[in-house]
From Swiss-Prot:
GO cellular component: cytoplasm
Keyword Cytoplasm among UniProt keywords: yes
Record's function text: Nucleotidase that shows phosphatase activity on nucleoside 5'-monophosphates.
InterPro entries, alphabetized: SurE, SurE-like_Pase/nucleotidase, SurE-like_sf
One Gene Ontology MF term: exopolyphosphatase activity
Protein name from the UniProt record: 5'-nucleotidase SurE
E.C. number(s) listed in UniProt: 3.1.3.5
UniProt cofactor(s): a divalent metal cation
Main location: cytoplasm
Membrane-spanning ranges: none
Cofactor info, note text: Binds 1 divalent metal cation per subunit.
Length: 247
């Protein structure tokens, strides 16, 4: 099976190196990643201008673009064989709840699904671990061995690892969840440049979430590994049915 590996943390990140190192033992891996940090870029795509791509060798490329650009090039620029599966990560920090709408990690997986390819987004609550995300990568390998046949064409699965990872190579702590409700409270710092022109710097979000059962947040807080199937179709089907019935 041919795996396309990308991320939004950039080519130098420990997470993508761990994925390639571990998954390469069992699969054909093809890596293309952004030249630099591209977090919080969702499904941004480079258009109206060219994009520089550097070939390291037949299996490794660097793109001066977004995560979605990397997937697009990997699928359609004829640099790799036919791709069977897209994996994005391992992200430095989790992507749960409504984070998935902003995440470049999830955005890359969504783009794979958009083109009919089963896709997995992987994130971790461990920040810069000494082992370089080796434990998470081993668990991704175990996950693929058990579940790859269940991920259908065009599906996206979102996997998040808690800070404490067993490292046993098993996925006994994996639970299937739904997305929770993330709450954001944005704060900007304003700096006046000249009269009438100011610079606004987002100083991070105060993040919270609703306490609900069955969500990725609940599983994560319990030290489990939440796995959430998500989809591209944003139609609110129940509401649509109601509108059609009552028209």
């Amino acid at each position: 099976m041919n795996l396309l590996i990308t991320n939004d943390d950039g080519i130098s990140s420990a997470g993508i190196k761990a994925l390639e190192r571990v998954l390469g033992k069992s699969y054909n891996t093809y890596l293309i990643a952004p030249l630099k940090e591209r977090s919080v870029t969702s499904m941004a795509l480079t258009v109206f201008q060219g994009m520089r791509v550097e070939r390291i060798n037949d299996n490794h490329y660097i793109a001066d673009g977004f995560p979605v650009d990397c997937v697009n090039i990997g699928l359609y620029a004829e640099i790799f064989p036919k791709i069977d599966f897209v994996i994005s990560g391992i992200n430095r920090g989790v992507n749960m709840g409504y984070d998935v709408h902003y995440s470049g990690t999830v955005g890359a997986a969504k783009h794979g699904a958009l083109h009919g390819i089963p896709s997995l987004a992987v994130s971790s609550g461990r920040i810069d671990p000494e082992d370089g995300y080796e434990k998470e990568a081993e668990l991704v390998l175990a996950f693929l061995e058990q579940y790859k046949s269940q991920i259908q064409s065009g599906e996206i699965w979102n996997l998040n690892f808690p800070p404490e990872v067993s490292g046993t190579g098993t996925i006994s702590e994996l639970v299937f969840t739904r997305l929770g409700r993330r709450r954001y409270s944005e704060k900007y710092e304003k700096k006046q440049i000249i009269e009438g022109v100011s610079e606004f710097q987002l100083n991070g979000s105060l993040l919270g979430h609703d306490e609900e059962t069955g969500t990725d947040f609940e599983a994560y807080a319990q030290g489990k590994i939440p796995l959430t199937p998500i989809q591209l179709d944003l139609t609110e089907k129940n509401r649509l049915k109601e509108l059609l019935t009552n028209r």
